[in-house]
Swiss-Prot record:
This is 3-deoxy-manno-octulosonate cytidylyltransferase. One of its GO terms (cellular component) is cytosol. GO terms for molecular function: 3-deoxy-manno-octulosonate cytidylyltransferase activity. It is found in: Cytoplasm.
Length: 246
């Protein structure tokens, strides 16, 4: 039985710059958004819904037995979209934790989604996200790979200090590839979307730095691997290859 205090929201829109229409791209016989929806449902942690500004996406989700909520087309980020969806789906405020699961993670595992929950046992934690250790120089140097920099507070847990597209931290020791899945306390999400974009957020083009600069606590759980995101046509072909074998 899922927990009514947890809401899993999947933002999805058709107007992606590098791969327009990607939520409905076919992967092994199903639209990509349906793969993500089913993995979120399999996690079994809370109510799951797709937040979209596109009636076609909402119709596909409904046709596959999922829940969709229509949101405005003008949102600057996925966080703003899930905030509107949260208000529509849960006006009574029963949901205490809101998870923002990217709609372009068709290979993410249910267990990976569950990993964001344990840190909320500490009431000081505002936001939880994920990262995986970097093992290749290519990953280490790529600006497209966001690095999570944090102080260890457990064997697989960091307290976030910074996020950057640069290679960081300097020197010997592990570096971590940030995974763009976020879980917010409801009050933290409310605060986050009320804040203006911050200087470092604009410089790095990383919205999580808005929370860091505002003094919000972000904990990072370390997972074994990075789920394959789909941003380009080659990414889509890779996802098709992986899921056609599963």
């Amino acid at each position: 039985m899922t927990d009514p205090r947890i809401l899993v929201l999947i933002p999805a829109r058709m107007a992606a710059t590098r791969l327009p229409g990607k939520p409905l791209a076919d992967i092994a016989g199903l639209p990509m958004i349906v793969h993500v929806l089913r993995r979120a449902e399999a996690a079994g942690i809370g109510r799951v819904a797709v937040a979209t500004d596109t009636p076609e996406i909402a119709a596909v989700v409904a046709a596959h037995g999922g829940e969709a909520v229509m949101t405005r087309t003008t949102h600057p980020s996925g966080s703003d979209r899930i905030h509107e969806a949260m208000q529509k789906l849960d006006p009574e405020g029963k949901a205490e934790i809101v998870i923002n699961l990217q709609g372009d993670f068709p290979t993410i595992t249910p267990q990976t989604i569950r990993e964001v929950l344990p840190p909320f046992a500490d009431p000081a934690v505002d936001i939880v996200t994920l990262a995986s250790q970097i093992h290749t120089e290519e990953e280490d140097l790529a600006p497209s790979v966001v690095k999570a920099v944090g102080s260890p507070i457990g064997p697989r847990r960091l307290r976030a200090l910074y996020f950057t597209r640069a290679t960081a931290p300097y020197g010997n020791g592990p570096r971590y590839h940030h995974i763009g899945l976020y879980a917010y306390r409801r009050a933290a999400l409310e605060r986050f979307v009320s804040l203006p974009p911050s200087p470092l957020e604009l410089q790095e083009s990383l919205e999580q730095l808005r929370a860091v600069e505002a003094g919000m606590r972000i904990d990072i759980m370390i997972v074994d691997s990075v789920p394959r995101g789909v941003d380009t046509p080659p990414d889509l072909e890779t996802a098709r290859s992986i899921l056609s074998k599963s």
